[in-house]
Design a protein with these regions (language model features):
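Hydrophobic alpha-helical transmembrane segments
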Residues: 1-62, 96-196
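Glycine-rich active-site/cofactor-binding loop and its immediate structural neighborhood
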Residues: 50-78, 82
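Conserved G/P- and acidic residue-centered "switch" motifs that form tight phosphate/ATP-binding loops
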Residues: 65, 86, 124
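Basic, amphipathic juxtamembrane/active-site segments
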Residues: 69-115
């Protein structure tokens, strides 16, 4: 939902930063790779129990994920390879983050939360897959409750606020796992109906 409504506004806000990045010689590929490295670093920190720091670093990586596309557009350097790399690193970053969460809760001796983390990451990967498949079939694959922006918000705040004794991690894992699979179902049904 936020992906569709807010992406254009966020891109406009990112324009001045993107122009500066382009002037400094930072291309979209470099920005994508730095964002991915931040996501992996954040995931490792989460696994080690530095939840707020890890979530914050993942958030910084997510901001770079917005910036790379804006830089590509402003500099006329949008390519199919860049789009592939961006999507690929986005998915790897999600897997890394949930692996960090699963490791952390496993270390706490909470097997139910480990299982829910696996369920969450599977759903999180299916959401963009269904969009890509729908678009490959010539129909609209966007929409649903938990787009990338919503998934990041729930993950970052749910993980990060746990460090401040707000007990947000367990509810966030449950909420994420349930809502992401609801989104999978939404996208599947919507695509199915368009193919009639």
């Amino acid at each position: 939902m936020l992906d569709i409504k807010a992406r254009k506004r966020v891109s406009k806000l990112a324009d001045p930063i993107a122009r500066l990045a382009a002037k400094l010689g930072l291309g979209p590929t470099a920005i994508t790779l730095v964002g991915f490295l931040l996501a992996v670093t954040g995931a490792v920190l989460i696994g080690l129990g530095y939840l707020a720091l890890g979530a914050g670093i993942i958030g910084a990586g997510a901001l770079l994920d917005i910036l790379d596309g804006v830089v590509a557009r402003l500099t006329g350097s949008e390519t199919q390879r860049g789009a592939l790399l961006d999507t690929f690193t986005d998915r790897l970053g999600e897997v890394a983050a949930w692996t960090g969460v699963a490791y952390y809760v496993g270390d706490l001796g909470k097997p139910t939360l480990v299982t829910l983390s696996l369920i969450a990451v599977c759903g999180s990967l299916l959401v963009p897959f269904l969009r890509a498949k729908a678009e490959a079939l010539g129909v609209d694959g966007k929409g649903g409750l938990m787009g990338r922006a919503e998934r990041l918000i729930v993950m970052i705040f749910g993980i990060g606020l746990e460090d401040f004794d707000l007990h947000t991690l367990e509810p966030a894992i449950w909420i994420f796992a349930i809502l992401v699979w609801f989104t999978v179902l939404q996208r599947f049904v919507r695509t199915w109906k368009q193919l009639e």
